[in-house]
């Protein structure tokens, strides 16, 4: 699938993102752009060091969300994000992965195959041009987009100083 560029003036651009401090002026997407128009998008996030608790929590939480046509939004990070994307797929739902880098580099590398699947059947989204690699400061910026796309936020586990809690604070 090719890369689409969505300007903030486009009908496809999620209007809730415009309410963010410093909204992205452009989004790069690969996959099913209509997922941006889904009426209910739910962020499912948690620790990169997710335990069996997150696995069990998503087994309980994601099926009813999928049954109600909710799109699962997460960040393709290792741990809870990966579990959320995989659970959405497993239960027949749709998912959006918001990246903290461009499409030419997938981080973590262990999620390259998952990212290819998402680009084909779901949606990858980034505010970064394709050639931009992952940088530490990109991930808090990514988190604001996860929050801005979502109508609700599900957190399974989080360390006291973590990107998950940054996203949660943005949601309050």
Predicted regions mapped to residue ranges:
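Glycine-biased, small-residue-rich flexible motifs in mid-sequence functional cores and linkers
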Residues: 7-172
